């Protein structure tokens, strides 16, 4: 139940089970920044045609100070991927499926039996940050720029150059528009919305995606957790629930740790930025795993 990237990517990988996807939305295809690791992309099991760009470097700035990160990241064209995946499975848009139990749903007054997997997305409850992203004409760069500001507590801004456009945005609490970097290019479009910032939640039965609040606390990225749960859910459907339960425990431990780190950084935001960037200014750090960018930076800022 749910036709976002979580539900559609899972259905794509479970095609031999003949899954049915119910989606409240009119049509699939959400716009997002879509920066993920190569590790995450590999586990989605989709074609490389959905990769718009590859990045080997991130520059993180605070005032006139910089920290460089060696990375291995990809830009996933999530909008096009969702549209294409919806065409290869039984996909029903504009359909509100009410989950009655892990084995039953209610669709337009009719009860349907079967294994229910919740991919219904975030319910809007709990803490959230606001995000806005502007799409401009392309610039000549292959480096992602991340900007931290004293007044944007717990948030950041970004510039992501792609071959055919440039993604420029900001997220944080309150009005984040003033933190969006200026770009001397023609504006093409604007999109955005709220992003959950919460600890992982308990959900009865099988679930995947933002319904679990399994998103990176600092950036709000959730595709990584989708990729990690695809294979464990398959094993659970085949009769072995242990891998799913173990992966949930692992995700919960890491995400809740991230939540605590970010909460600590928010309480001493200005001090953390000044101290951290004074110690790491001009240095280059290597990021090898999915959470390292956040754990590495925030951990060093706080210690």
Residue locations for each model-derived region?
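Conserved mid-domain beta->alpha element of the FAD-binding
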Residues: 166, 196-259
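Short, solvent-exposed loop/turn segments at secondary-structure boundaries
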Residues: 30-34, 72-73, 171, 218-222
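C-terminal helical "tail/cap" subdomain of flavin- and related membrane-associated enzymes
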Residues: 235-303
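A conserved beta-strand/loop capping segment in the N-terminal third of enzymes
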Residues: 35-84, 90-94
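Glycine-rich FAD pyrophosphate-binding loop
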Residues: 1-5, 12-32
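Predominantly flavin-linked oxidoreductase catalytic cores and closely associated redox partners
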Residues: 3, 13, 83-204, 212-215
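A short, flexible beta-alpha/helix-coil linker loop
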Residues: 27, 65-67, 212-215
């Amino acid at each position: 139940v749910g036709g976002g990237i979580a539900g559609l990517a899972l259905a794509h990988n479970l095609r031999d089970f003949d899954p049915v996807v119910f989606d409240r939305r009119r049509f699939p295809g959400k716009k997002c920044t879509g920066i993920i690791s190569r590790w995450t992309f590999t586990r989605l099991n989709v074609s490389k045609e959905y990769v718009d760009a590859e990045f080997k470097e991130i520059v993180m700035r605070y005032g006139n100070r910089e920290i460089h990160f060696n990375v291995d990241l990809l830009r996933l064209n999530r909008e096009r991927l969702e549209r294409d995946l919806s065409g290869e499975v039984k996909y029903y848009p504009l359909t509100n499926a009410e989950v009655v139990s892990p084995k039953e749903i209610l669709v337009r007054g009719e009860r349907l039996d079967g294994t229910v997997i919740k991919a219904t997305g975030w319910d809007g409850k709990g803490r959230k940050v606001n995000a806005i992203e502007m799409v401009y004409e392309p610039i000549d760069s292959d480096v992602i720029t991340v900007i931290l500001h004293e007044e944007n507590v717990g948030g950041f801004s970004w510039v992501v150059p792609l071959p055919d456009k440039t993604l420029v945005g900001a997220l944080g609490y309150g009005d984040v528009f003033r933190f969006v970097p200026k770009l001397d290019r023609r504006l093409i479009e604007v999109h955005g919305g709220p992003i959950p910032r919460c600890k992982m939640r308990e959900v009865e039965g099988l679930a995947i995606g933002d319904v679990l609040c399994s998103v990176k606390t600092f950036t709000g990225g959730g595709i990584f957790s989708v990729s990690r749960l695809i294979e464990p859910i398959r094993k659970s459907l085949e009769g072995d629930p242990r891998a799913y339960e173990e992966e949930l425990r692992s995700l919960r431990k890491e995400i809740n740790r991230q939540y605590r780190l970010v909460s600590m950084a928010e309480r001493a935001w200005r001090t953390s930025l000044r101290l951290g960037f004074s110690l790491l200014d001009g240095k280059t750090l290597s990021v090898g795993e999915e959470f390292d960018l956040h754990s590495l930076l925030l951990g060093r800022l706080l210690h």
